[in-house]
Amino acid sequence: MNELSDESILKYTKKISENATIDNWNDYKWQLSNSIKDVDTLENFLGITFDEKEKTEIQKAIDVFPMSITPYYASLIDIKNLGKDPIYKQSVASSKELILENFEMEDPLSEDEDSPVIGITHRYPDRVLFYINPNCAMYCRHCTRKRKVSEKSSNPSKEEIQKAIDYIKNNNKIRDVLLSGGDPLLLSDEFLDWILSEISSIKHVELIRIGSRVPVVLPQRITDNLVNVLKKYHPIWINTHYNHPVEITKESKKALDKLSDSGIPLGNQTVLLAGVNDCPYVMRKLNQKLVSSRVRPYYLYQCDLSKGISHFRTSVSKGLEIIESLIGHTTGFAVPRYVVDAPGGGGKIPVMPNYVVSWGSDRVILRNYEGIITSYVEPSDYGGCSKNCDTCDRMCIGDFEINQTGIEKLITDVDNSISLIPENNERVARRDD
């Protein structure tokens, strides 16, 4: 596990201030106040010198997409391997970000279009994304929300946050609230406590999730006081954002342990990034280190169509190759779900290798990770569903609502639909002529 010695830490702190100490280094507020935001500071901190052309190109990118790196995260950069270093690529601005493709978008997931009130994205029936803070400890170069991160105009007021909470209160189908940003854990303990208290008091909200990269880039933020705030509101889940095994350091592991020991389940959402983790063996090592740190791999995201990140995108086939190399080759719950977050707001679409080879009238032909092909004989007397939920003998506890959407209508026994037809289909329209 990566670990900085006290001597190395002092070397870095002295680059920032002659009077700085290890206690300063371990103070998240000191880390934030000394974030690296320009090329000169980066050169001084790392002890490197860019040539003038490269320095100018980096600065041009910063002028369009601001840079901010915590000293802690910058200390993980391998200065002997800058061109290939995964920490450097994720954190330092690049002229490649200025190459804009015509298919790239500021809001590729149409989060703003699915926003009924400021701060809320309501895409799925029973859950919402609650955008509570535009600020991040570090500005990831592959960020899908570059349009909002660090923008003061994107910072919701307390009144706007209250209106968003009221929206959740007034929609009793919402059972799951995801706090997002920016990074929710950069809010003050007191303000975060208030938000969590308000949401947890809503009877129909069953759980709260928090998406945060703080354990990765600013583990010092996971203080005892913050943990005491969070654990008051179980069930609360936290999804981290580790992209490479070198990010799991001693300091980061300590932060994860604090969260896990307080009873908070941890998941991880990785973005597939060209030149960073687009390798089956890097991804396997990452997920195995996560599991040993009590973090379950949750999603592997295909890189979005946001502006300025085309150099990070891989082919979808690369993602499938990685999943193929994980299934069967490592622990089952060390395999994330590979998804494409559909442009235009279609939501997360799982993409998986195909393990069904063929079907017969009474059997399914399957293959395993080794290439072994096998036959599974299906039951001959399976009766399916009576399609009458009022007389069903399945032990379904409590009230529930049948609200089928999309392919679910065609594949379940409850609905009699035989096809899904897009709106304005010309052939169907001719039937009415």
UniProtKB/Swiss-Prot annotation:
Coiled coil: none
Domain of life: Archaea
Gene3D superfamilies, alphabetized: 6.10.140.1170, 6.20.120.40, Aldolase class I (3.20.20.70)
Domain Radical SAM core: 122-334
CDD domains membership: Radical_SAM (cd01335)
Binding annotation for Zn(2+): C279, C389, C392, C396
Keywords attached to this entry: 4Fe-4S, Iron, Iron-sulfur, Isomerase, Metal-binding, Pyridoxal phosphate, S-adenosyl-L-methionine, Zinc
Cofactor names: [4Fe-4S] cluster; pyridoxal 5'-phosphate; Zn(2+)
Described function: Catalyzes the interconversion of L-alpha-lysine and L-beta-lysine. Is involved in the biosynthesis pathway of N6-acetyl-beta-lysine, a compatible solute produced by methanogenic archaea that helps cells to cope with salt stress.
Family of the protein in this entry: Belongs to the radical SAM superfamily. KamA family.
Record-given protein name: L-lysine 2,3-aminomutase
Source organism per UniProt: Methanococcus maripaludis (strain DSM 14266 / JCM 13030 / NBRC 101832 / S2 / LL)
Gene name of this polypeptide: ablA
